[in-house]
Swiss-Prot record:
Cysteines paired by S-S bonds: none
Stored Gene3D superfamilies: 3.40.50.2020
Subunit structure: Homodimer.
Gene that specifies this protein: pyrE
Function: Catalyzes the transfer of a ribosyl phosphate group from 5-phosphoribose 1-diphosphate to orotate, leading to the formation of orotidine monophosphate (OMP).
Organism for this UniProt entry: Thermoanaerobacter pseudethanolicus (strain ATCC 33223 / 39E) (Clostridium thermohydrosulfuricum)
Domain of life: Bacteria
The keyword Cell membrane is assigned to this record: no
Identification of the protein by name: Orotate phosphoribosyltransferase
Length: 190
């Protein structure tokens, strides 16, 4: 799938939002990517998940896991594409855990997925969880990589599209300095 095609779908679905946003990473940005808009349409969920699954073709994958909330539907749909088990990790008292009877068995090959990667914080938490359970993380996949190539997961990282979007620390944010109201659209509680 070409970048222009992805951007056309994003535009059609209203994925790209402009304003002053507090990202899940804690950074500020003038752009927020609301990938949940993709997942409200099974057709587009399947398209993007299939694209991501193809990037890991040839890998033996037993489990696909994503962090709640952004990775839940993506993990399910990618798992469906590759014939694997789908799980999601969620925070309990600030720590990523498997709940609801989910388990990763020792030695299982695990693909970690997330809708958007900026700093990779949530993904790294899931990787640490999988490693603590003696799973074998074979890679990380996302629909959007907005890290500008700065994230290193120490396993292959592949995305459907890379979009560089400027992010700022709170103290350096020009939008804060202009007095533009801050919006927190993400799912993580601070």
């Amino acid at each position: 799938m070409e970048k222009e095609e992805v951007l056309e779908i994003f535009s059609k679905l209203g994925v790209i939002n402009k304003g002053h946003f507090l990202l899940t990473s804690g950074k500020h940005s003038d752009t927020y990517l609301q990938c949940a808009k993709i997942f409200q349409y099974p057709k587009y969920s399947e398209i993007f998940s299939k694209e991501l699954a193809l990037k890991f073709k040839g890998h033996e994958i037993d489990v696909v896991i994503g962090p709640a909330i952004g990775g839940i539907i993506l993990a399910y749909e990618v798992a469906r594409q590759v014939g694997a088990k789908a799980l999601f990790a969620e925070r309990e008292e600030g720590v990523m855990k498997l709940r609801r009877g989910f388990e990763i068995k020792e030695g299982e090959n695990v693909l970690v997925v997330e809708d958007v990667v900026t700093t990779g914080g949530s993904v790294k938490e899931v990787i640490n969880l999988v490693n603590s359970l003696k799973g074998n993380v074979i890679g990380v996949g996302s629909i959007v990589d907005r890290s500008d190539g700065k994230v290193n997961f120490e396993v292959p990282f592949k995305s459907v599209v890379s979009l560089y979007v400027e992010t700022y620390e709170k103290e350096e944010c020009p939008l804060c300095k202009e007095g533009i109201p801050l919006v927190k659209p993400g799912s993580r509680k601070f």
